[in-house]
From Swiss-Prot:
Changing residue 434 to S: Mild disruption of iron-sulfur-binding. Strong disruption of iron-sulfur-binding, leading to destabilization of the protein and preventing its purification. Changing residue 336 to S: Mild disruption of iron-sulfur-binding. Strong disruption of iron-sulfur-binding. Strong disruption of iron-sulfur-binding, leading to destabilization of the protein and preventing its purification. InterPro entries: DNA_primase_lsu_euk (IPR016558), DNA_primase_lsu_euk/arc (IPR007238). Changing residue 152 to Q: Temperature-sensitive. This is DNA primase large subunit. It comes from Saccharomyces cerevisiae (strain ATCC 204508 / S288c) (Baker's yeast). The keyword Glycoprotein does not apply. Keywords: 4Fe-4S, DNA replication, DNA-binding, Iron, Iron-sulfur, Metal-binding, Primosome. Residues 210-239 are annotated as: H-T-H-like motif.
Length: 528
């Protein structure tokens, strides 16, 4: 069972019968059924033996279910960390990033969220549990299954490429798949000439081995897989494998496509089985809220965790009641915030959801409580329709409450995209919400044109909106409006934008770098 840690869940039930179900599944050796169940009991010694089997290689097809105890805190945090990586991959794929670009973005995040190339049992345990937890989250519909399989398969490819050649061989051998059996050294020697002639071009163009002696040296160490040619029909058509007696000979460096197809096929089958066993978790009122939260696509943006303790502080000395209207600051606002600011400027008022969304955003970028009251009072009273007395009576408390200065003194955080999308859609006279979801294509297209996006770029953004990928649409706009400047972000930083404040933070960071470069250029020119 899960241990309670730092959390107390009300209305706990007796789960002894549930444990019996799990044990019976495991006792009869029904690993397909057991794969779907994470809650189970085992001694620490049994757990060590099991993980010794699970972790024979640094990479896994996740064939066996995890056992043993983890806390609810681990359950949630491990799943969220893995989900961050998968959503980043999904976002990169939707934005047509190249494989090399995705690897550059993802690899550093492994070290922070999901350490992989390590001997640590705890890290491997986290990898294993988080994968199975997310199976429970994303087995519930065909669309969710397809997204999960696509992202996990790409993650598998990146990890495989990070292994050494020795570890790759060890992993393939551990799979014990009929299709993935290496030929003997004797058979390789017998077919050496034909095999080298077939793969020489691939060694040059795929592995950049331009010298003949380099290719021959690599070939001497390379292992080959023999399998029915119909399993690699695409490679056969491109003449990338040697054929003999109905069998194709596949070099180890080309086996990844075969492995990833096998991984994706197995995972999809297991997700369907997981869905069939999902009703067994309906009695567990501790897990369902977490699973429902995760399966909605929820993720905690890096901004939330990194800046959680700074929301009530002035993190940018230049942020005050006047500067938030300035071109320098407002040019970094995402479209949703620009819309709110325009609505406030036009009407000298915002309705409740609009006030909350904008107030907490401004708090997040560093607007202090005193400056916030100054900002809102000036905005509401500027046209003379509202007196200062009415503002203090009807609105002052609410804005102070957002800063934790009234009521229960809760330090509210800025809304992320998930929260914004969960609120009621805006009606006539409302300015809150997400423009990528709530605006018509005509209005959104006109706005994007005013931001100097090309027609092809606008179509790309609208396509993401049509698919319901609103945060991806926003991320595309960020990249298109910042051009290649986004490459100046720190390596390993989250590129997928799922928070208005993250958009602002990234844009402001790039803006300050550009300002610094311009100052240095002026200084250098002045000294010549």
């Amino acid at each position: 069972m899960f241990r309670q840690s730092k959390r107390r869940i009300a209305s706990r039930k007796n789960f002894s019968s549930y444990d019996d179900i799990v044990k019976s599944e495991l006792d009869v050796g029904n690993t397909n059924a057991a794969n779907q169940i994470i809650l189970s009991s085992s001694s620490s010694e049994e757990e060590k033996k099991l993980y010794a089997r699970l972790y024979e290689s640094k990479l896994s097809f996740y064939d066996l279910p995890p056992q043993g105890e983890i806390t609810l805190e681990q359950f949630e945090i491990w799943a969220i960390d893995r989900l961050k990586i998968l959503l980043e991959i999904e976002s990169c794929l939707s934005r047509n990033k190249s494989i090399k670009e995705i690897e550059t973005i993802i690899k550093p995040q492994f070290q922070k969220l999901l350490p992989f190339n390590t001997e640590s049992l705890e890290d491997r345990k986290k990898d294993y549990y988080s994968h199975f937890i997310l199976r429970l989250c994303f087995c519930r519909s065909k669309e969710l299954r397809e997204k999960f399989v696509r992202a996990e398969t790409f993650l598998f490819k990146i990890r495989f490429n990070m292994l050494t050649s020795t570890d790759q061989t060890k992993f393939v051998q551990s799979l014990d798949l009929p299709l993935l059996q290496f030929i003997s050294n004797e058979e390789k020697a017998e077919l050496s000439h034909q095999l080298y002639q077939t793969v020489s071009a691939s060694l040059q163009f795929q592995l950049n081995l331009n010298e003949e002696h380099q290719r021959k040296q690599y070939f001497q160490q390379e292992k080959f897989i023999k399998l029915p040619f119909e399993n690699v029909i695409e490679l056969v058509g491109n003449r990338l494998v040697f054929l003999k007696d109905g069998y194709a000979y596949l070099p180890q460096f080309q086996q990844l496509n075969l492995l990833s197809n096998e991984f994706a096929s197995k995972l999809n089958q297991e997700l369907i089985k997981t869905y069939q066993y999902l009703p067994r978790l309906n009695e567990d009122d501790r897990l369902l809220p977490i699973l429902n939260h995760l399966s909605s696509g929820y993720t905690i943006a890096d901004f939330n965790q990194q800046k959680a303790n700074q929301f009530s502080e002035n993190v940018d000395d230049e942020i005050n009641a006047q500067s938030v209207w300035s071109e320098e600051i407002s040019s970094n606002y995402p479209l949703c915030i620009k819309n709110l600011m325009e609505g406030l400027k036009k009407n000298h008022h915002l309705r409740y959801y609009g006030r909350q969304q904008l107030s907490l955003f401004l708090k997040g970028i560093g607007l202090s409580a005193d400056e916030a009251l100054k900002f809102w009072s000036e905005a509401f009273t500027r046209n003379g329709n509202m007196t200062m007395e009415k503002f203090n009576k009807e609105y002052r408390y609410s804005f102070r409450h957002n800063y934790g200065l009234e009521g229960n003194r809760i330090n509210y955080k800025p809304w992320d995209c998930h929260t914004i999308l969960s609120k009621p859609r805006p009606g006539r006279g409302d300015y809150h919400g997400c423009p990528f979801r709530d605006w018509s294509h005509e209005r959104l297209s006109a706005e994007l044109r005013s931001m100097k996006l090309t027609q092809a770029q606008i179509i790309s953004v609208l396509d993401s909106c049509q698919k319901g990928e609103y945060t991806i649409a926003c991320t595309k706009v960020f990249e298109m409006t910042h051009n290649s400047a986004s490459a100046d972000l720190e390596i390993g930083e989250q590129t997928h934008i799922a928070h208005p404040n993250l958009y602002f933070e990234r844009s402001r960071q790039l803006q300050k770098k550009q300002q610094k470069l311009e100052k240095e250029k002026l200084f250098n020119n002045g000294n010549h």
